[in-house]
Amino acid sequence: MSNEAFYPIGEPGQPWGGEEKAQWLATQTRKRSYHDEVVREIDGLRADFEVSEYGRLTYGHDVYPLYAVRSRPWLAGLPTVLVTGGVHGYETSGVHGALQFLKTRAQDYAGRANLLVVPCVSPWGYEHIQRWNPDAIDPNRSFREASPAAESAALW
């Protein structure tokens, strides 16, 4: 078994402090565009679905609108199905799978279920291909009241 740290920052087995988090963040670079690859796809769904901005994340100079896509019509008597993608930004298939589902299969559920799809919970993570947000917080471990992860708090 190896004791080698996943990141060459800090000490294995010790939680990161502010200095280690800043050191990690300084190594992060944008590798793809949330706007070009995700938001444009969501915009293309507006004719068939209700698209709403349920929040906004601001990290440094970057602002990320958060979108939810709902089936139309929304019928109170039907069960509701929630589909999320991109809680961890490096899980690209979840983001594109949610978008593909909306384009190709969502209409199969018309009259049977209300669909609420959040294709990309963590847009900064998506752009940087990271599990964490820029505060080194894992949004997937943070779906709770008073969440330290803004991505998770926006859905709470």
Go through each PLM region and give its residues.
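Short glycine-rich or small-residue beta-strand-to-loop segments that form or flank ligand, phosphate
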Residues: V81-G86
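Residues at the C-termini of beta-strands that transition into short coil/loop
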Residues: G55, R72, V121
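Generic structural signal for beta-strand residues in well-ordered domains
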Residues: Y59, W74, D108-A110
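Short glycine- and acidic-rich boundary segments immediately preceding or forming the N-terminal edge
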Residues: M1-Y67
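Short beta-strand-to-loop junctions in surface cap/lid or active-site-entrance loops
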Residues: L66-G77
